[in-house]
Amino acid sequence: MTFERSGTRHDLAARHARVVRTLRLAPSVVRVTLAGAELADLPAGGPEDHMKVFFPDPATGELHAPRMVEGALQRPTSGVSVSRDYTPRAVRPTADGAELDLELVLHGMDDGAAAAPAASWAAAASEGDELVVAGPRGSRGVPAGIERLVLVADETAMPAAARWIEQAPHDVEVTVILDLADEEVDAYVDAPAPDGGPSPFERASVERLYRIDGPGQVEEAVRSLDLSGETTYVWAAGEATSLIPVRRYLRHELGLAHEQVKVDGYWKRGVTNRDHHEPLDPSDPD
């Protein structure tokens, strides 16, 4: 079966916003809410939309923001321009613009602010702090015609996984495999949605795995699922290297069609600011 995914292209814009509140969802996860007039037309229609978030230089605290030149982002030629890609967790209109929720994982901080500028900023973020967000460039909807949705995600992919659940039709069966650092992250899974409603994961059948228990658990959990149905769609995202065997199993052993599977390496251990558009497995690109 071929799934249709609606797609929309957006005009790229760099938007300034300021922190209005923060909420620690778990010891290692913080929700940062930004607001501003420039967010009023921010598009965020798809479950896995992503935008570039520009942070202050960790050495100086100065924000070296990009500017738009002929429809393209141009970073400043002087100063350090720091950016990372994030999925917008939620966007809400306000009387004078909009609010944007971002959920940031505080990992890599043991090596200092220079090694983890986004996490270090998020850990200390306070009301009035300024950021610049650019994008998303496009949005793709939930595939039409699916009857079962299987999601595999670590902490970095949970905002997108939550959006998948929220946007999937109510008659779609949702199965989730979560690859979590440890049991402290359970608080993030169970946290209320940004609008104050229940956690979207309450709707799904959720298996929680903990990396402290050893490697290989995600692949084993995926192999235990019955994925034979033609109306099943599988989306997986997280640390790139750990997802390579998952993708190989889904695409080659099971033989699921390209249109039925998406596996996205949001980050890669030992690599700074990995471009998630790069092939997950360079030896076997789609």
Role assignments for model-derived ranges:
Residues 1-286:
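Extended, composition-driven regions rather than compact fold-specific motifs
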